[in-house]
Amino acid sequence: MKVYTRPFQKEVYDKVDGPSKEALIKYLESEGHTIVSKKEDYYADVVTEKDGITFFHEAERKAQWKEEWPTYWEEIRIPGRKRRLVEKYKDQLENLYFYVFNKHYNQAWKINGTQMVDAIIKEATGPTYRIPKGETFYHVPYQEAERVDIV
């Protein structure tokens, strides 16, 4: 499927990028990772090292997710534009992780890069008043992701 992405929304990026990275770094450091880079370079948000292995991490926020994950949201949706990361790190997908944070940045879904396959890229369905027609997402069943707490 052709990946459709909406135009860049600087005001949204400016609002969520800093808090998303801060929450991600807090979680990663609590898991024993050393931060190698958090520089904005259009690739992974945060690069870490743990046990001599380099890892790549990308953060998103789902503002509509406030407290507990509603189980009627059967899928976690990661924008199709993130395919550029899957392509960039295609030889290291087992070391690539995507995180989708809730509104409060105290919980996240963690998804491994190996799960990000073209077969799960689809247009969003359901109430899509915030999503431009045709925008594509990776649709990952929430049962196939790991929920992590940020403390």
Residue ranges of predicted features:
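Non-catalytic C-terminal interaction segments of nucleic acid-processing enzymes
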Residues: F8, S30, D91-V151
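Short linear motifs in intrinsically disordered
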Residues: H33-K38, R84-D91
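Short His-Asn-centered micro-motif
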Residues: K38-E40, H57-E60, F101-N102
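Short acidic/glycine-enriched loop/turn segments that link adjacent beta-strands
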Residues: E40-A44, Y105-N106
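Short connector loops at helix/strand junctions that flank enzyme active sites
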Residues: D41-Y43, G52-F56, D91-E94
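Mg2+/Mn2+-dependent nuclease catalytic core
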Residues: K62-Y89
